[in-house]
């Protein structure tokens, strides 16, 4: 029985990892535009970084819901390191959106925690 439950649970993983969701605000910002905003230090850079910080906050909130779970990813992530991480990601993945970068960052941060 335990083996059946485990197989069922593992079969759900790809569905969770590829879930579609509505992206609002700066998450629709394409990576080349983020890199340009970084180079010019425009207001769009700050709104983009704030959007990603909110995304991380939302993930932490969602993770904390089950019975007061203490899941705080990105605890040591500074705004300066976030700006650099996003630029590196966007340079390597110019076809992606800021939301894709945020998702990749969450995966990386979860692996570290």
Sequence positions of predicted segments:
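Short N-proximal segments of mature Sec-exported proteins
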Residues: 22-88
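Positively charged n-region of N-terminal signal peptides that target proteins for export
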Residues: 1-4
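Surface-exposed, polar helix/loop patches in the mature regions of secreted/periplasmic/lumenal proteins
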Residues: 76-113
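Boundary at the C-terminal end of the N-terminal hydrophobic targeting segment
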Residues: 17-21
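Bacterial N-terminal signal peptides
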Residues: 7-14
């Amino acid at each position: 029985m335990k083996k059946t439950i485990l197989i069922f649970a593992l079969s759900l993983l790809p569905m969770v990892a590829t879930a579609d969701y509505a992206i609002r605000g700066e998450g629709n910002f394409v990576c080349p535009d983020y890199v340009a905003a970084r180079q010019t230090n425009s207001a769009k850079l700050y709104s983009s970084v704030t959007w990603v910080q909110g995304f991380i906050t939302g993930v932490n909130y969602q993770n904390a819901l089950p019975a007061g779970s203490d899941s705080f990813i990105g605890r040591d992530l500074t705004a300066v390191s976030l700006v650099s991480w996003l630029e590196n990601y966007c340079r390597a993945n110019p076809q992606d959106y800021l939301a894709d970068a945020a998702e990749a960052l969450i995966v990386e941060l979860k692996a570290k925690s």
